[in-house]
Amino acid sequence: MSWFAIRVTYGRELKFKQLLNDAGFECFVPMRKKTVEKDGRKVILTVPAVANLCFVNSEKSLLDKFMRSFGDSCWGRYIWDKATRKPIIVPDKAMDDFIQISRVMSDDVLYLKEITSKLRQGQKVRVVKGPFKGVEGTVVRIKRSRRIVVELPGMLAIATTYVQPQDLELM
């Protein structure tokens, strides 16, 4: 089983995730909290953090069969690796770390769509304490604070909130 990145059309991430869950697939849509004003009151909503993105843990053949059952009207399509011309498969450890960071749903967690060489230059570390315990990534300074960046190859990266130096272990 592998984690596949799926591009979902027209903001239907949660509906597509529900369809997949009902069919027995393991899915993940990164979420964040958003404050909106409704009738003069502030309301906190939980919305997808990255537009049109869903991750599915499955055998490719089963996922293909599910998506083909909708014909051309399927809401999801694989995100392709341009170099290999195959669907992007996210490594299990990177996906586990991504999910762990995403579930914190803090305003300080950043989703980075552009992965620059600066993000790859930091030291490789493992978090040994706190809400991100077990996460492995690269230490990078973003917005004046030391954060751990976990990259999903070929797609995006996620940066944690500030992590204390004593909570880190060099790899």
Region roles according to the model:
Residues 128-135:
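Short coil-to-beta-strand transition motifs
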Residues 1-121, 138-171:
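Acidic-enriched and Gly/Ser
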